[in-house]
């Protein structure tokens, strides 16, 4: 049996940023435990990493907009503090603007309507001519039907970011419990920790945080989580054909192309709810075809890796973020927005775990809303 002040179940991007936020606020790192059999893996390992509150706008998801905007605004200081804790660390944080392009006339109509919707919500989105766009990104196809630029949408490399967080937390003394979490432990109405491993060893904490994505389904909480699989590709090129994130609509299908600081290019992502646990052939084919239609030179790249991740979806696409009981903080169900919302999720989680009032309006994200 081990006892800590803060026990965080899950060491993906949400758990890692929550632990780092606690350390930033002066919590003794040795009083924090992260419970995860494979830290910095899972959906984090397959994520795109786009910090794109404007481009991620979806119709009828208004409660998400302010959360995404606030979280994106927190990223510069979060990255700066992480790099300060480990000088020389590269987390793949890039601040070039994002281009969103349309492949044909129907896509251009959709892009125009989406841009009007974004403007309605006060988002900074600028229309460009194709000539203007190709003067900055000559790798774009000359056959595109429309382009907009979003100055405030940036990116981080999820693998590098998570690895850096893990290194810093370990160096500072955060305890890693590399075992699978079992049941939560309760004394009356208060959560007092979690069982881990096959021997059901107790890891006790004054506050317990549920940050383990789909794994939260096994903890006995009333969370309506479902796996939404996403196929993603990693390409290699001696010289990247684009220098910023390119998002596109191709016959109404979304695709993104993300050049990384490590020389790779991420292409994604499908969204499917089926039984195929490995990358789907139709998904890989469609991603490559659509990406090459937008940036033709991608056909000269090497295919390094095809991946599939399980994203934790909820019925309304909002995360479960809030108190799940006495001494229990729930922070999961981030679906496609885990990387983007990690900074805000960490701030709210730390606020709640330290018994402070959070300034973030999370009324729509209550963990018990789907009971």
Feature map (PLM): residue ranges:
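Active-site substrate-recognition segment that forms the wall
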Residues: 20-27, 37, 49-50, 55, ...
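Short hydrophobic core segments
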Residues: 7-9, 35, 202-215, 346
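Helical element adjacent to the flavin cofactor pocket in flavoenzyme catalytic cores
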Residues: 147-191, 195-198, 207
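N-terminal Rossmann-like FAD-binding beta1-loop-alpha1 element of flavoenzymes
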Residues: 4-33
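Conserved Rossmann-like nucleotide-cofactor binding loop
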Residues: 14, 40, 215
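Dinucleotide-binding Rossmann-like beta1-alpha1 core, especially the glycine-rich loop
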Residues: 50-132, 292
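Helix-loop-beta segment of a Rossmann-like dinucleotide-binding subdomain
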Residues: 88-102, 114, 121, 126-172, ...
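C-terminal catalytic lobe of FAD-dependent flavoproteins
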Residues: 297-371
């Amino acid at each position: 049996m081990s006892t800590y002040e803060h026990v965080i179940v899950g060491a993906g991007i949400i758990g890692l940023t929550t632990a780092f936020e606690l350390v930033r606020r002066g919590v003794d790192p040795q009083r924090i435990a992260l419970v995860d059999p494979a830290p910095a893996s899972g959906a984090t390992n397959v994520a795109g990493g786009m910090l794109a509150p404007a481009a991620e706008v979806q119709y009828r998801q208004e409660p998400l907009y302010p959360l995404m905007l606030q979280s994106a605004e927190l990223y510069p200081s979060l990255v700066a503090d992480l790099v300060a804790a480990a000088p020389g660390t590269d987390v793949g944080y890039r601040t070039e603007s994002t281009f969103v392009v349309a492949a044909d006339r129907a896509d251009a109509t959709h892009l125009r309507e989406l841009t009007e919707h974004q403007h309605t919500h006060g988002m900074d989105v600028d229309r460009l001519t194709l000539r203007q766009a190709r003067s900055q990104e000559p790798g774009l196809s000359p056959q595109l039907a429309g382009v907009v630029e979003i100055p405030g949408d940036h990116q981080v490399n999820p693998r590098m970011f998570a690895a850096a967080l893990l290194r810093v937390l370990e160096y500072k003394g955060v305890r890693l419990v590399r075992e699978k979490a079992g049941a939560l432990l309760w004394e009356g109405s208060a959560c007092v920790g979690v069982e881990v491993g096959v021997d059901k060893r107790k890891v006790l904490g004054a506050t317990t945080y549920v940050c383990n994505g789909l794994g939260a389904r096994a903890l006995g909480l009333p969370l309506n989580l479902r796996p939404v699989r996403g196929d993603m590709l990693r390409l290699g090129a001696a010289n990247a054909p684009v220098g910023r994130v390119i998002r596109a609509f191709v016959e109404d299908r979304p695709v993104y192309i993300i050049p990384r600081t490590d020389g790779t290019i991420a292409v994604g992502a499908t969204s499917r709810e089926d039984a195929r646990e490995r990358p789907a052939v139709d998904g890989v084919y469609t991603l490559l075809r659509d990406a090459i239609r937008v940036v033709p030179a991608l056909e000269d790249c090497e295919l390094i890796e095809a991946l599939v991740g399980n994203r934790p979806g909820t019925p309304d696409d909002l995360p479960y973020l809030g108190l799940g009981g006495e001494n229990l903080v729930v922070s999961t169900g981030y679906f496609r927005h885990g990387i983007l919302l990690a900074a805000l999720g960490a701030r709210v989680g730390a606020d709640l775990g330290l018994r402070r009032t959070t300034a973030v309006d999370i009324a729509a994200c209550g963990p018990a809303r789907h009971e």
